[in-house]
Amino acid sequence: MAFTDTSAISGLVQTAYDRYVEFALRSQPMIRAVADKKPVQQAMPGSSVVFSLYNDLSAATSTLTETTDPDAVALSNVDTVSVTLAEYGNAALVTRKLQLFSLSDVDPAVADIIAYNLADSLDVVAQNVLRQGTNVIYGGTRTSTATITASDTIDSADLRKVVAKLRSNKAVPRAGSLYWVGIHPEVSHDLRAESGSIGWRDTHSHTDASLGNLFAGTIGTYEGAFFVENARMFSAKDGADQTALATTAVTVAGTSAGFTFGVASSAVIATRAEVGDKISGTGIASTAKITAISTSGSTTTFTVDVANTAAVTATTVVTVTPVTRVFRTILCGKQALAEAVAQEPGVVIGPVTDKLMRFRPIGWYGVLGWSRYREEALYRIETGSSIAAL
């Protein structure tokens, strides 16, 4: 019996595609909203903007003498904070051929991606300034970033300490009597998992009408602060070394002065190593850290940040030492961060200037900058996370 099936008329059997293309998962930019100090009476355009702060007089506690004219006192000079302006931007060049051949309309997608890149990029730049504040406490009993381990997690005492310091510094709260906290979800997990009466307790919903409109992502108020949970809060593999993973042999050699070598994709280090971990072995530079990991078939390729000192031969035994990821939780009051803008960032549709009008530019551009304005209104808590390695 002969069937007229999909094999018989295979030319009519095609793969179908969904023309709706999803975007990558995104976190919501939020740091620019913290920059609430901006120029009020800027004198002129310039490459930088200087803010000035008066200093108060010392308290006059001595009594006056009835017949003696008190001595005048001179006011101290103002303190200044400078914000250096810089150009920021990015661009894409879409070809006419892509527009004609694409199964999905790319123009709206490119516009959306460019717009998000604008907000995302500037938020990273602003956070890089904010997270460098001079006031910092470390999880557990640690005294530096490099000594923090995964067990040095955040606790309520850390928050009480920082809120007390902010109030002692006379920092102005950001919402009612509450300070702002930017916290990573993996740090928030540890805080809310604290057990007993000292743990995450008596929290209030961020919908409390008396607090006004708080930040998107607010998860509650606690210990004198309101918490904004966001995965974009900075973390880095710059804590203490952890226990080394099981060693394994190289299967794809790396050249001298090269930056790569390969191991079996089934090896422990192939499945558990992360970018930022240390890696060592004959021919690998002593300070090498992993910058990229890619797997293709049975081989996992490691890229390191320092060139190999010699050939990394096949069968060379390598060791990966995981480095603790340290999370930065930021607490601040008003005027912790200043922002100055010469041109507000925005999307730019560039002119089509090629001879055949095939190349269509779209990008974003802005001229602005940030600086910490009141250090006394800014604190940072550096901790590990109990779930960072999961």
Task: Please state what every model-predicted region is.
Residues 1-84, 378, 382:
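N-terminal "assembly arms/tails" that initiate or stabilize quaternary assembly
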Residues 5, 346-390:
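Extended, compositionally biased alpha-helical segments that mediate assembly or anchoring
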Residues 51, 77-139, 171-187, 354-367:
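Long, contiguous amphipathic alpha-helices that act as assembly "spine/axial" helices in icosahedral shell
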Residues 136-223:
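Extended, solvent-exposed, turn-rich assembly/linker loops in the middle of proteins
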Residues 204, 232, 238-273, 280-330:
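Small/polar beta-strand repeat architecture
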Residues 216-243, 323-328, 340-346, 360:
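Long, compositionally biased low-complexity segments
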Residues 321-354, 385-388:
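Hydrophobic alpha-helical bundle architecture
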